[in-house]
Amino acid sequence: MFRIGQGFDVHQFVEGRPLIIGGVHIPYEKGLLGHSDADVLLHAVADACLGAIGAGDIGRHFPDTDPRYKDADSAELLAHVWSLVRQEGYVLVNADCTIIAQKPKMAPYIEEMKKVIARLLEAERSQVNVKATTTEKLGFTGREEGVAAQVVVLLQKSEA
């Protein structure tokens, strides 16, 4: 059996925070605002995985009203989500990830993001695609107010 999940997340830029996207620290003058480390890409991956197994969203599992998740490492949150996926008996077929940001340029960091996501999802790098696009200076991402990410995952019931 196959299951598809789709995830989407948005965070706004603020001064004084590190910029972490896809588990990679990116040198930039601003970071993303959030209760956790605000890793917009890993949040979208987590939501896609949760959606594929019908388990709600990251807000339900890691509420921003819970102090345990203040400044949480999103890689740890995704690792927990992946353990739920594995408990349901699924493995990753593939993940297709899109980062939407005017700045900074993501190209230098894409391969490392793929490596991080593949490791967290117990997959090969070839099963994870990460790409970035701009909105041609339109909307909040175009005005450099924040970053968005969308992710689609395909899971398959494990034979093991």
Curated annotation (Swiss-Prot):
Cofactor (UniProt): a divalent metal cation
Positions contributing to a divalent metal cation binding: D9, H11, H43
Membrane-spanning segments: none
Keyword Oxidoreductase attributed: no
Signal peptide: none
Keyword Transit peptide: no
Organism: Geobacillus thermodenitrificans (strain NG80-2)
Binding locations of 4-CDP-2-C-methyl-D-erythritol 2-phosphate: 9-11, 35-36, 57-59, 62-66, 101-107, 133-136, 140, 143
Chain positions of site Transition state stabilizer: H35, T134
Disulphide linkage map: none
Designated gene of the protein: ispF
Source taxon at top rank: Bacteria
Organism placement in taxonomy: Bacteria, Bacillati, Bacillota, Bacilli, Bacillales
InterPro entries: MECDP_synthase, MECDP_synthase_CS, MECDP_synthase_sf
Reactions mediated catalytically: 4-CDP-2-C-methyl-D-erythritol 2-phosphate = 2-C-methyl-D-erythritol 2,4-cyclic diphosphate + CMP
Key words, A-Z: Isoprene biosynthesis, Lyase, Metal-binding
Pathway field: Isoprenoid biosynthesis; isopentenyl diphosphate biosynthesis via DXP pathway; isopentenyl diphosphate from 1-deoxy-D-xylulose 5-phosphate: step 4/6
Family: Belongs to the IspF family.
E.C. number(s) listed in UniProt: 4.6.1.12
GO function term, MF aspect, one: 2-C-methyl-D-erythritol 2,4-cyclodiphosphate synthase activity
Protein name: 2-C-methyl-D-erythritol 2,4-cyclodiphosphate synthase
Binding note for cofactor: Binds 1 divalent metal cation per subunit.
Subunit structure: Homotrimer.
Main function: Involved in the biosynthesis of isopentenyl diphosphate (IPP) and dimethylallyl diphosphate (DMAPP), two major building blocks of isoprenoid compounds. Catalyzes the conversion of 4-diphosphocytidyl-2-C-methyl-D-erythritol 2-phosphate (CDP-ME2P) to 2-C-methyl-D-erythritol 2,4-cyclodiphosphate (ME-CPP) with a corresponding release of cytidine 5-monophosphate (CMP).
GO biological process: isopentenyl diphosphate biosynthetic process, methylerythritol 4-phosphate pathway; terpenoid biosynthetic process
Gene3D superfamilies: 2-C-methyl-D-erythritol 2,4-cyclodiphosphate synthase
CDD domains reported for this sequence: MECDP_synthase
